[in-house]
Amino acid sequence: MKPVALAVAALVAALSIAFRADAQEPIKIGIIATYSGQFADTAQQMDNGVKLYMKQHGDTVAGRKLEIIRRDSGGPNPDVAKRLAQELVVRDKVDILAGFPTSPEALAAADVSAASQKFMVSMNGTASMLTTKSPYVVRTSFTLPQVAQALGAWAATKGGIKKTYTMVTDFGPGIDGEQYFQRGFKESGGEIIGSVRSPLANPDFSPFVQRIKDANPESIFVFVPGGSQPAALGKAFADRGIDPTKIKIMSSGEAVDETAIKGLGELAIGRLSAQHYDYNHRSPKNEAFVKAYNAEFKRNPDFFSVGGFDGMHLIYEALKKTVGKADGDSLVQAATGMQWESPRGPMLIDPETRDVVQTIYIRRVEKVDGKIVNVDIDKIENVKDPVKASK
């Protein structure tokens, strides 16, 4: 054989070996979450969604094994989340970043995603600006403006509420929620009579709730992050005699998720909320999801759970489209525009913003067959993130 032919044959053989080796290497997914601290339960629920999806669909996609590497931020701690993201990319050589029960940590990790060109799936981070921080970030949760503006408009047009007071946590998602609830409410004819913000870390809600009580509002819109804070705020309302059957209390879903309702008991009855998911949502897809989740984890799923479940669905389907290619450009191109039927209902990854377009459900807490649950009373379909939709 001539030298040139030998060289070509050697090159082809080398490329073939390299291709086979790459095909056999696992795709590494680094999950950053608050596995300890005040938001530990939210991280666990999100991670349960990840685990359930992988149990149902296996750990191999497009001929490549998936390897999950979990890291605890102990947060919310953006600096730690950013360091963990850097370590996952540089030391552990992950292909995909995922997780993020809190927005501050998702925003910090997005800088690493942008710099390293790594695909990143936010399974819960709700700050609207998140997807603008990196062209490789895709969201499978929701944005606070998405639910808050929808709730504000509904309250003024269908809820019979004309005046309200707002109280939110003083960080990105809370400020988003305040601004866009007020926009939806005022544009639909409602009046804001006062606003107050509470700190993110270990807040004492008492003085803020007292200010609201002194204003004697017809209704209140609140946002606090998930975890232990919703029940603590609800108890502060009760301690000061604010009764949701007399003064309408409205919120996004965190304030009336199952954990909060367990902490509040009958104090939760009558509360109104807007959210994209609740385990009590009636559909065959969700009933199957809840049954499987209960069997595996002996508890009900929440919106953190469905965010993790749908986040893994997005990763699996994107990898199928790329036939196992896990670079950021290939995966984000495969993910944008993707549509599927989730336990929450129909989902679309907006091809322009990489946010979720989905149904927002208006719910009221009621006692049904002896159980205190959220009951869907209305829905708003095909809701986009209004921050980007208005630009």
Language-model segments: residues:
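Extracytosolic ligand-binding ectodomains
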Residues: 2-9, 19, 23-391
